[in-house]
C-alpha cells in the first residue's frame, strides 16, 4: 500500500492552487503513475526574490457589497508574489484572494489576524490579481499592498 501511495504522490500533475492544500501538490494521474513519470514543480529560489514598489489598496474602510479586482503586472517576471502592509476583514463574510490571471486562487485571507508584511504564495508568471469580496454588513480596514516581489 505504501509503495502505491508514494508512487501516486510522486507522479501527480502539479496544480498551483493545490500546492499548499494537499500532500501531492496536484492531481493524481493514472498515466503518470503507470509509466512512473515524475513532474517537477517549479519552486523558486528564495534568494532571487526582488522587491518592486507597487501600491494598490481598497477604500478604508471598504464598502459593503464589493466585488473588486486589482491587477498587478510586472513584464518578464517568471514568479510573482504580493506583499501586504495591512489586511483586515470581517471574519468569514468578507475576504480577499490572490489569484493567477486565469483565476486560480493561490492565497486566501479573511478576518483580522494577519501579520503586517504578510506575503501571498507565489504565482508562476508575471500577473497577479487581488480580488476583494464583501457582504452587506460590517466593514473593516481592507487591504494595502506596498510592493510585489518577483523573480525574472
Whereabouts are the PLM-identified features?
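Domain-level representation of secreted and single-pass membrane ectodomains enriched
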Residues: 42-152
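C-terminal subdomain of the subtilisin-like protease fold in secreted/lumenal serine endopeptidases
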Residues: 1-48
Amino acid at each position: 500500500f505504501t509503495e502505491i501511495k508514494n508512487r501516486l504522490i510522486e507522479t501527480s500533475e502539479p496544480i498551483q492552487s493545490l500546492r499548499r492544500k494537499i500532500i501531492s501538490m496536484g492531481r493524481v494521474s493514472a498515466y503518470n503513475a503507470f509509466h512512473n513519470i515524475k513532474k517537477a514543480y517549479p519552486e523558486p529560489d528564495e534568494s532571487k526574490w526582488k522587491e518592486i514598489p507597487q501600491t494598490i489598496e481598497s477604500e478604508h474602510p471598504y464598502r459593503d457589497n464589493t466585488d473588486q479586482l486589482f491587477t498587478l503586472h510586472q513584464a518578464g517576471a517568471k514568479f510573482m508574489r504580493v506583499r501586504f502592509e495591512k489586511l483586515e476583514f470581517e471574519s468569514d463574510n468578507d475576504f480577499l484572494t490572490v489569484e493567477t490571471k486565469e483565476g486560480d486562487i493561490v492565497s486566501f485571507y479573511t478576518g483580522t489576524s494577519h501579520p503586517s508584511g504578510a506575503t501571498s504564495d507565489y504565482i508562476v508568471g508575471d500577473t497577479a490579481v487581488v480580488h476583494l469580496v464583501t457582504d452587506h454588513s460590517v466593514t473593516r480596514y481592507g487591504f494595502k499592498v506596498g510592493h510585489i516581489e518577483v523573480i525574472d
